A protein has these predicted regions:
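Short helix-loop junctions at transmembrane helix boundaries
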Residues: 1-7, 66, 343, 358-403, ...
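Peri-transmembrane interface segments
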Residues: 2, 66, 259-311, 320-322
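N-terminal Sec/SRP start-transfer signal
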Residues: 3, 15-58, 434
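C-terminal membrane-exit region of the final transmembrane helix in multipass inner-membrane proteins
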Residues: 19-26, 31, 395-434
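Hydrophobic alpha-helical transmembrane segments of multi-pass inner-membrane transport and secretion
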Residues: 39-66, 292-327, 350-359, 409-413
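Hydrophobic, regular-secondary-structure patches
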Residues: 60-143, 168-173
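Basic-flanked hydrophobic alpha-helices used for secretion and membrane insertion
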Residues: 182-278
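Transmembrane alpha-helical interface segments in multi-pass membrane proteins
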Residues: 318, 327-371
């Protein structure tokens, strides 16, 4: 909404400038040349505008990259772009009572629908369960939170899970598991060790298997790595005594998530399936919290920059009016209307804002290029164990537009009061000014 209002305001300013260039060219030329009469003031004001614009551009690019990397990390740590659930999934803590039955048939029907399959990169079911895992040779055991995954799709859906020992799950060997780094440390388990797994299956009985440790992974999220275990979906279904899954994850070829969700919901309604659909953003409370925090900080920075620019422009224009009082009154005395005088000063404010905006973009791109040569080393986020290298994203059209628009808009607004003040000078009193 605020961008729409800003765009409307800029449209009005552009119409005003084009009108002056076409029908009042002398006024536009006179206002532009006036910028060079007091070069020091013009340069200092332009530099202040550029500092604000560059700050918005660089921090906005940093925020964009942070959102992008957090989004990709969220999607590719076994969440996907879209998830399908049984409605009971969010109503009970016993996941065995909220399974999606006959997953294989559901997957086949979705892939046979070309309106959906054309946008799908990967589709995979996952079965959630928990229990106790033991390593008898080391006399260690621990609680685990298990995930049955399809090995091949999980390479994409879990691509941010970094394998630090061994390898990912095999499509052929179904008697192997991978553990989170923290859980493997608790069990003192290493590649090739045999682990005993016990759980309560969907029928209320005991499920038990002995499986071989194929690999150890790290997602960078400590709480998850301390309890995480993955095994092939077929093995997990055998252990739990079901052919269902807890959820179906879909990774898309593009980011048209909302459009795909609408088509998927239509498909579900058409087939009368008792299922619900959620996007990756709905499934990630952590992302929503981080987005709200960083967006709030960014808004505050934009507000501060806008106030600084308004103050600098207003102060410069006021000083300009004081120094040019005799000039203004002379123009008024030879017949210039108050509206004409206001137009001259408004154009000056718009021109200096435009110069500052262009300079902000040029310097912003140069500094972003220098920073991106090496990146910015970032510490781990709260609850995570791995830091990352951040960069400045410069391909966001909205950010580029904002960096240009904000200086122009704020300088135009800051010129209004000084322009009105100049047009209302009393001619007889102003001639006495020295």
């Amino acid at each position: 909404m605020h961008m729409l209002l800003m765009n409307l305001a800029v449209l009005v300013i552009m119409c005003f400038v084009f009108y002056c260039l076409l029908f009042k060219f002398r006024d536009a030329k006179f206002s532009f040349l006036n910028l060079f009469r007091h070069k020091k003031r013009t340069v200092s004001t332009t530099i202040a505008i550029m500092l604000g614009g560059v700050s918005i551009f660089l921090y906005g690019g940093f925020i964009d990259y942070s959102f992008w990397i957090l989004k990709e990390q969220t999607i590719r740590t076994n969440i996907g772009h879209v998830q399908i659930y049984n409605p009971k999934y969010f109503e009970t803590s016993n996941k065995s009572r909220s399974l999606i039955a006959d997953y294989a048939n559901l997957k086949k029907e979705i892939l046979n629908d070309h309106a959906l399959s054309d946008d799908i990169s990967t589709i995979s079911g996952q079965l959630e369960f928990s229990g106790v895992i033991s390593q008898y040779e080391n006399v260690t055991s621990s609680f685990f939170s298990g995930l049955g995954v399809e090995p091949l799709p999980s390479l994409k859906l879990g691509s941010f899970d970094k394998v630090i020992s061994g390898s990912d799950l095999s499509r052929v060997k179904t008697n192997e598991v991978t553990l989170g780094e923290g859980l493997a440390g608790t069990l003192n388990a290493n590649y090739g060790d045999w682990l005993d797994i016990m759980t309560v299956n969907t029928h209320g009985g005991q499920g038990a298997l002995s499986l071989k440790l194929r690999g150890i992974f790290s997602s960078g999220i400590k709480d998850y790595d301390d309890v995480a275990m993955k095994m092939p979906l077929a093995t997990a279904q055998k252990l739990m005594g079901t052919d269902g899954v807890s959820k179906v994850l879909i990774l898309l070829k593009n980011d048209n998530t909302d459009m795909f969700i609408d088509r998927l919901r239509h498909f579900i309604d058409e087939h009368h399936l008792p299922l619900i659909v959620k996007s990756w953003k709905d499934a990630s409370i952590f992302y929503q919290q981080v987005e709200s925090l960083l967006s709030g900080i960014y808004f505050f920075i934009k507000l501060i920059v806008a106030l600084i620019v308004i103050f600098m422009i207003s102060n410069a224009m006021t000083m300009n009016i004081i120094e040019r009082t005799r000039e203004i009154t002379t123009l008024r005395a030879i017949g210039l209307q108050p509206l004409h005088v206001s137009r001259l000063f408004l154009l000056e404010g718009i021109f200096i804002g435009t110069l500052g905006a262009i300079g902000s973009l040029l310097i912003g791109f140069i500094l972003a290029g220098i920073i991106n040569l090496h990146g910015i080393a970032m510490p781990p986020s709260p609850g995570q164990t791995q830091g990352y290298t951040a960069f400045i994203k410069t391909n966001n059209i909205e950010l580029i537009w904002l960096t240009f628009v904000l200086p122009v808009l704020t300088s135009s607004l800051a010129s209004i009061l000084p322009a009105l003040r100049a047009s209302r000078l009393n001619i007889s009193d102003a001639f006495k000014f020295s």
